[in-house]
Structure formats: structure tokens, C-alpha cells
Amino acid sequence: IMGYGKIDPDIEADILTLKANPYPTYTFATHLVEIEIDEELGALELKRVWAAHDAGTIVNPMGTEGQIEGGVAQGLGQAVMEKVVRENGYVTNPHYRDYLLPGAKDVPLEIECILVGNYDHTGPYGAKGVAEVSLIPIPAAMAGAVTSASSIQPTHLPMESEYLLRLIERRDEEKL
């Protein structure tokens, strides 16, 4: 069996003003997280995630949920672990023994995927992409949860223990 398909998305670009709508469709997502922060150690743990995604027509619900769960794991890594260390223009942690990624113990057991299926006329069968968009909300949701839980406001990633401890110490000094 052989098939052929073509899509001609309605995208616009104005070369004079440099304004464009480069994508035929957009996926929307929002995440809510429950965290636990140990203020003595600066340890941050992601306990639960609620992930709502408008992915168009959901063609494969189990596959879609798997993509979202994988994105949550990637977002967790970006939020608290992944840090490129440079010295004199060279990366000094180019190996996985030095560049940390989340493992099975780090990812929360409870990830509730809320699939919103709004048909999209430009996607195949009305579907939209869901993979990468699922990692984007996690760092911001976790930073917001840290602020809500401890009255500190992280401003950069990753939110490592040492960094959170400095923020906690600064908060406590300001209270005196």
C-alpha cells in the first residue's frame, strides 16, 4: 500500500514588517503541580501533576498520555536538575555522570492527564502536536508552587537545593 498526502497550511509572513504566523496550528496546555519543599535541606520534590492539553482530536489517548508524561519528566529535569556548566567557553559536564536527568524515582507517580479534544482543521484527523509542549509548563508551575509554599521566588533554572537554600536564608534574614 502506498499513499501520498499534502498539506498547504494557511500561514502568513510579511517580509517588510517581519511579522508572521509561522505555524498552522497551536497546542495549548496548562499544568498544576503539588510539590514538597524541605526548607532545611532545600530539597524540592514533585508529588503530583495535573496536565490539561488541547491536542485537537485525540487519535490515540494512551499514546497522547505517554507523550505528556514524558514531557513532565523532561520539564522536571529542566526545573531542578539539568545544568550545563561552562568554564573558559568549554562545557565541563558533557557526560551523564555529571549532567543529571530525572530517573524513575524522580518522576511523580500521579500525573493526571486531562485531554481536551478540540478539532483542528489543519491537523491530520483534526489532531495537534502534544510532545514538546508538555514539558514547557512544568518549570514555571514548580517555581510558582515554591513561591506559594515558602514565600521565596526562584528566578532561574535549575532550582537546585543550594540555590533554594540561599533564597530561604535571604528570606529569613529579611524577616529579622
Predicted ranges, named:
Residues 1-176:
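Cofactor-binding beta-sheet edge motifs in enzyme active sites
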